[in-house]
Every structure is written in C-alpha cells, then in structure tokens.
Regions:
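Basic, Lys/Arg- and aromatic-enriched nucleic-acid-binding interface segment
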Residues: 1-25, 33, 59, 68-70
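Phosphate-coordinating loops and pocket residues in cytosolic domains that bind phosphorylated ligands
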Residues: 24, 32, 161, 165, ...
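C-terminal secondary-structure termini that scaffold catalytic or DNA-interacting sites
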Residues: 34, 43-70, 74-79, 99, ...
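Active-site/catalytic core of tyrosine-dependent DNA strand-transfer enzymes
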Residues: 42-53, 74-122
Length: 183
C-alpha cells in the first residue's frame, strides 16, 4: 500500500475530515508544532455544462462546504507523529501525494474500497471514516459542541442526527451513571 494513501486514510480516521478537504489539504495547512490542521479548501468534481462531448466534469479547488467548514482541527499525538514522519520539503505539496499534484476524491475512494475489500470488509466508503470518528469521539466523552465544530457542521443537530451512532455498550454505560443519583 502506498504510504500516502495510508496516511490519508489514517488522518481521516483521526480527524473526521471530509474527502474533498483531505484531497485539497497541503502541508502548509498542517502544523505539527501546533498539532493542528487548518481546513480552508476543498476539492470537488463538478459537472461542466459548457462541454457537450468528452469530459463532462472538472476538478475545482475552492472553499469548503460552508462557512463553519473553514476551521482548525486539533490533532492527536498519533496523527501529529504521522504527519511529522510524512512531511516533505515543500509546504506546497499535497498531503495525499507528497507532490504539488493533488489526488482526486474518487481515486482515494477507489483505493480505500480495494484495501477494505482485501481485508474482507464490504460497503466501506470514505465517509464511513467520518462517521466512525464522530461515533468514537462521543463514546470517549467528547462534548458535542466541540465535536460539531471539529466536523465543520453548522449545528450540533447535524452532528447528532447524522453522525453519532449510539452503541448498546454506550447506552449501558450511560444507564449505569444513574447509580450516582440513586436510581
């Protein structure tokens, strides 16, 4: 497995970053000293209505999904260490390639599907990493407002309704907390 793809997959799992944000992420936006990633751009494939034949889409790097998607994501020690080991000389290099050429989201999605299928996992998409990050963050006790900001959501309702999946174990743990109040 190429190290850049693996690093991108692990970074997404550690931060909840969107695929388009990761594909547009350059090393100049990663600070291992501050242990943070600054999200200010996203890469997306758009339909090009001006083309009648041939390639009907084009790649655009622009602002992320919403105003709240422009954010700083703190990194774990693991993610920071990974970035320190990976960082190339050029700060203009993209995180996923180590060069000044970006990787398309569908290429990264294709690679992830191949790797997970080789591990016997079916139906894993890149967005699954974001869901997993959010669910695990809640399980370890993240405050939902902070998690919502890390994910770049416009409201905590989006975070709770779409990304947080309560497990039976978490429900049991929460029920046991009632012992504290004598119930």
């Amino acid at each position: 497995m190429p190290i850049w793809y693996l690093a991108g997959i692990l970074l997404a799992l550690c931060t909840g970053i969107r695929i388009g944000e990761l594909c547009a992420l350059q090393w100049e936006s990663v600070s291992t000293n501050d242990k943070a990633i600054r999200i200010a751009k996203a890469l997306q494939r758009l339909h090009d209505t001006s083309v009648s034949q041939g390639a009907r889409t084009r790649i655009v790097i622009g602002p992320p999904k919403s105003d709240t998607s422009v954010r700083t994501i703190p990194m774990t020690e693991y993610a920071t260490g990974l970035c320190r080991r990976m960082k190339p000389q050029s700060s203009a290099a993209y995180v996923l390639t180590g060069t000044e050429a970006f990787m398309e989201p569908r290429t990264l999605q294709y690679r992830l599907e191949k790797y997970t299928q080789a591990c016997g996992l079916e139906g894993v998409h890149f967005h699954t990493l974001r869901h997993t990050f959010a669910t695990r963050a809640v399980e370890v006790g993240f405050e939902v407002k902070s998690l919502s900001e890390i994910l770049g959501h416009t409201s905590v309702t989006i975070t709770l309704d779409r990304y947080v999946h309560a497990s039976l174990e978490l429900k049991r743990d929460n029920m046991q907390k009632l012992k504290v109040v004598g119930l």
